[in-house]
Amino acid sequence: MHCMAVHQFSPSIVSSLPTISTYNNNHFCRFFTPKTSISPISKTKSKSSTCYPIQCTVVNNSSPSSTIVRRSANYEPPIWSFDYIQSLSTQYKGESYTRQLNKLKKEVTRMLLGLEINSLALLELIDTLQRLGISYHFKNEINTILKKKYTDNYINNNNIITNPNYNNLYAIALEFRLLRQHGYTVPQEIFNAFKDKRGKFKTCLSDDIMGVLCLYEASFYAMKHENILEETRIFSTKCLKKYMEKMENEEEKKILLLDDNNINSNLLLINHAFELPLHWRITRSEARWFIDEIYEKKQDMNSTLFEFAKLDFNIVQSTHQEDLQHLSRWWRDCKLGGKLNFARDRLMEAFLWDVGLKFEGEFSYFRRINARLFVLITIIDDIYDVYGTLEELELFTSAVERWDVKLINELPDYMKMPFFVLHNTINEMGFDVLVQQNFVNIEYLKKSWVDLCKCYLQEAKWYYSGYQPTLEEYTELGWLSIGASVILMHAYFCLTNPITKQDLKSLQLQHHYPNIIKQACLITRLADDLGTSSDELNRGDVPKSIQCYMYDNNATEDEAREHIKFLISETWKDMNKKDEDESCLSENFVEVCKNMARTALFIYENGDGHGSQNSLSKERISTLIITPINIPK
């Protein structure tokens, strides 16, 4: 994925994203996966995770005389049981742990404020806080430091030589990444200082392997047409690959006089970056990995930071477990999981998405509400993708569009409960906003669901007619049919307080979605396709982006996958550029949009992390939600 930026990109794929389409279907549903029982694994014998198109005959209760042939995806039941989820407990609750955390927080604050503003140590400390997942505690301090750094080095002084670290690749690349991450448009030309007279990066830079790794990570903050950053990506990739090859040679290790711990740490970090760059990773997963695999082994490990990071992770995890238990009780009470055995019951996986979107302890309401949406999107997606007839799907779409609970009697029996739960859930969310802000947002929320269901319906029509869409047609529909737009629209109202007329004008909900939402949704769609398209085609579904590209260009599957990865990289460049028309959108909301893309890449990195319930999915859920980090007493 790291090499994708060297390709040419067709701007029509992103720039022609539609105003609210009247199409249908979704793959956002593949967001969710396992299920476990008290053990924690259910004692019920698991079925194969492969989805097969199975024909089954079902009598339509609405029309007793008619027999309908329906498809089945043969989804596994959930492995995470209600009883197991309710049994989750942790010791990391209560005032004693909070007092301990606050004491450590004061010590870390003193560290931050005690370092000289232009020191490399200060940059490294900020980077370490981020990778340990605790930088959110010091948001104001970090923002103040970086603002002063940017002002001193790039506003008041236009000459790079005034930067004391100007000839240090590691320091400059780290500073560039941190400043761009926080919204400062540091010029890419800063890296020209590391080029020779021919305009090529100096070969001696490869001796600074951590500097090259920082350069590689910095290149992912590129925007469109930033050619210097494209060059840094190519150069750093080549250097890192050569280093990895050298480290496989025992003689080279002796020549370089590196100890095994240093080599292993470097190789771990490089492999980790090649899998996904830091900019594309979710905070919570990165924190657990960095704590477990890297930080304790570092020679300059700070015991205060380490203790603070582990304790904070466990305290926040205890809040996540409470949120999950609340969600589990809601899911049990609405009884959808047991009534619709053709659909995926993916409660735990839905919650994992929410942890990726907003993990901080203070956002419990956001997680509890938004996780319901993930669950409902999965269920409704399976109705459209697998079970419903075209006539039934048109009825359901019309009912959502008219938003009248009286229409429930016009629906087939199996659709009544999903429609009723959807109607009640969205109205409940609207009521919460009305109480808190005296603002009626039901029309906005409803519209996002209407858009989604129309997209589902259009994809169903494609399927039943055997239509082969072009890649452009598919992406114009697919960025909406993935369902992420529904999540983000609801997230906006959860995270924005107060809601102003200027905010609503920026959203332009009556016409189209903001670019930041479109971009996040497109990455989510493409990541989903990379992870799930084979299984979906096996069970009977419309062609995905991979197959559309193969059809359009007479390409192989490998070539198509490379192109989809390239589109993801190009869309990230669009998302890296702040749209002035969206400047009034809150920082929290913009970050959640980016986190949607990051979480999709995390979920689908190694296949269908939402629906397959494989060992990797179970391990991720366990480490992030269930199992605390060991803290010796």
UniProtKB/Swiss-Prot annotation:
Instruction: Supply the InterPro entries for this chain.
Output: Isoprenoid_synthase_dom_sf, Terpene_cyclase-like_1_C, Terpene_cyclase_plant_C1, Terpene_synth_N, Terpene_synth_N_sf, Terpene_synthase-like, Terpene_synthase_metal-bd, Terpenoid_cyclase/PrenylTrfase
Q: Place the motif DDXXD motif on the sequence.
A: 381-385
Give the binding site residues for (2E)-geranyl diphosphate.
R344, D381, D385, R525, D528
A molecular function (GO) held by this record is: magnesium ion binding
Q: Which residues bind Mg(2+) 2?
A: D381, D385
Where does this protein reside within or beyond the cell? Answer: Plastid, Chloroplast
Targeting signal (transit peptide) range: 1-55
Pfam families, sorted: Terpene_synth, Terpene_synth_C
Which positions in this protein are listed as binding Mg(2+) 3? D528, T532, E536
Cofactor(s) needed, names only, are: Mg(2+); Mn(2+)
Q: Where does Mg(2+) 1 bind?
A: D381, D385
- Biological process GO annotation list? diterpenoid biosynthetic process
Q: Which UniProt keywords apply?
A: Chloroplast, Lyase, Magnesium, Metal-binding, Plastid, Transit peptide
Q: Quote the EC number.
A: 4.2.3.15
Catalysis performed (reactions): (2E)-geranyl diphosphate = beta-myrcene + diphosphate
Decide whether keyword Zinc-finger is in the record: no
Record's Gene Ontology CC terms? chloroplast
Cofactor comment in the record? Binds 3 Mg(2+) or Mn(2+) ions per subunit.
Pathway of this protein? Secondary metabolite biosynthesis; terpenoid biosynthesis
Q: Which family does it belong to?
A: Belongs to the terpene synthase family. Tpsb subfamily.
Please explain the role this protein plays, according to its UniProt record: Involved in monoterpene (C10) olefins biosynthesis, constituants of cannabinoids and terpenoids-rich resins. Catalyzes strictly the conversion of (2E)-geranyl diphosphate to beta-myrcene.
* Note on domains (UniProt): The Asp-Asp-Xaa-Xaa-Asp/Glu (DDXXD/E) motif is important for the catalytic activity, presumably through binding to Mg(2+).
Q: Give the protein name, as stated in the record.
A: Beta-myrcene synthase TPS15CT
Organism of origin is: Cannabis sativa (Hemp)
